[in-house]
């Protein structure tokens, strides 16, 4: 029998220490990685519940194990809430990640050797949309569209390639694209050539849920997403689909590519979907956009170039070449000042991916802390201070002290 006194602090001091240090890092550093956010205590409570003990292969009302009457309630709540949140006909909340959600759709309707078309990774796409080293690039014939001279999606190129290659599936969505995507235009060309249309909205899901970014659900056959990032839930994935595709998607996830679902994570998803349905979530997402705009403008004012010259979402790519610094070095320097970012390639980047000429920044996490435009502008100036003085230890220490003032004033968990 387990005793409730057998806490982690008592039973595994090494692991406990590492977790405490990470908690301190999250509190004391400004998080600007666009794919990261902070979940609510309620989400973490659900994930740390006894639901982690339950195996539940199958779907609500049709399980391969007994004792699933209560986890059925949990999963059905998640399904119903996410359908309401995005206006979807059907949903699967079992994917363990966004990548597995994408893989599930591929497994459902494609065969090895089929042609797919997605956004080039080098110009802002995601590795699961056809990167050569990814399963999607190994299993399928890949055609990639990219950006035009204005660093906007080249819709004319996309349409031309679609008509020429007639892919079985067209994919929209990105991991490093700051502008709005015209999902309706993608849907029209997909219909014209008889292709499936899938949208990976992982980065934009929170904004879409709040009505602050175009909703792909009315246009796409399949919409995949993560549940973290801008949606502010646990780490996981889900798939939205037309009702006609529900059976094949469910079969593709289980037993196709996964076994028993992670019921404690699905519970966390259900909590996050309920939170996203609240009016406060719309206010939060509106502030996410305001903060991203303020951050971008502050950086531009300090001589940095934003790819596409603006952001229309939570994310932006910063071209560092004018500062004569690589993304790898900028990430390390900013990290030493307690500002967390990630190096990222920019369009036509001359550097290798692990070096890169840019950094990717996002506003969701700092907005969760309570930052508004004034703080976002200050963060932009602190970033520029570091990049303007990369070899000055005094500047790093000064910026670190300014960061501490901000993080103390805006704790992650009050």
From Swiss-Prot:
Q: Which organism is it from?
A: Herminiimonas arsenicoxydans
Keyword entries, A-Z = Amino-acid biosynthesis, Cytoplasm, One-carbon metabolism, Pyridoxal phosphate, Transferase
Give a GO cellular-component term: cytosol
Q: Which residues form the signal peptide?
A: none
Q: In which pathway does it act?
A: One-carbon metabolism; tetrahydrofolate interconversion; Amino-acid biosynthesis; glycine biosynthesis; glycine from L-serine: step 1/1
Protein's recorded name = Serine hydroxymethyltransferase
* Stored InterPro entries: PyrdxlP-dep_Trfase (IPR015424), PyrdxlP-dep_Trfase_major (IPR015421), PyrdxlP-dep_Trfase_small (IPR015422), Ser_HO-MeTrfase (IPR001085), Ser_HO-MeTrfase-like (IPR049943), Ser_HO-MeTrfase_PLP_BS (IPR019798), SHMT-like_dom (IPR039429)
Q: Which residues carry this modification: N6-(pyridoxal phosphate)lysine?
A: 229
């Amino acid at each position: 029998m387990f005793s409730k006194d057998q806490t982690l602090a008592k039973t595994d001091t090494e692991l406990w220490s590492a977790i405490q240090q990470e908690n301190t890092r999250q509190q004391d550093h400004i998080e600007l990685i666009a794919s990261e956010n902070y979940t609510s205590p309620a989400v973490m409570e659900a994930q740390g519940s006894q639901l982690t003990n339950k195996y539940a292969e199958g779907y609500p009302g049709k399980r391969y194990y007994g004792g699933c009457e209560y986890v059925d309630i949990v999963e059905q709540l998640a399904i119903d809430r996410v359908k309401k949140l995005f206006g979807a006909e059907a949903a699967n909340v079992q994917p363990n990640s966004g990548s597995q959600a994408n893989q599930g759709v591929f497994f459902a309707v494609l065969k090895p050797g089929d042609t797919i078309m997605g956004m080039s990774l080098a110009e802002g796409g995601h590795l699961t949309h056809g990167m050569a080293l990814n399963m999607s690039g190994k299993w399928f014939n890949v055609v990639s569209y990219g950006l035009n001279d204005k660093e906007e999606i080249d819709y004319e190129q996309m349409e031309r390639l679609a008509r020429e290659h007639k892919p079985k599936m067209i994919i929209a969505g990105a991991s490093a694209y700051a502008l709005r995507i015209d999902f309706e235009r993608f849907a029209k060309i997909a219909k014209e050539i008889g292709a499936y249309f899938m949208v990976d909205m992982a980065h934009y899901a929170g904004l879409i849920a709040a009505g602050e970014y175009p909703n792909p659900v009315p246009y796409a056959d399949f919409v995949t997403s993560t549940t973290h990032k801008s949606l502010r839930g646990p780490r996981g994935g889900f798939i939205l689909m037309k009702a006609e595709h529900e059976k094949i998607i469910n079969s593709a996830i289980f037993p196709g590519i996964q076994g028993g679902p992670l019921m404690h994570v699905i519970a966390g998803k259900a909590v996050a979907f309920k939170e996203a349905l609240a009016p406060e979530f719309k206010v939060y997402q509106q502030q996410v956009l305001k903060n991203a705009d303020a951050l971008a403008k502050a950086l531009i004012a300090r001589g940095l170039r934003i790819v596409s010259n603006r952001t229309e979402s939570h994310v932006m790519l910063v071209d560092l070449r004018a500062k004569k610094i690589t993304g790898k070095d900028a990430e390390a320097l900013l990290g030493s000042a307690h500002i967390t970012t990630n190096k990222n390639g920019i369009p036509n980047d001359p550097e290798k991916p692990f070096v890169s000429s840019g950094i990717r920044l996002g506003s969701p996490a700092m907005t969760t802390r309570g930052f508004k435009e004034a703080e976002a502008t200050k963060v932009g100036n602190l970033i520029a201070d570091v990049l303007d003085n990369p070899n000055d230890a005094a500047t790093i220490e000064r910026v670190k002290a300014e960061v501490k003032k901000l993080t103390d004033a805006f704790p992650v968990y009050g």
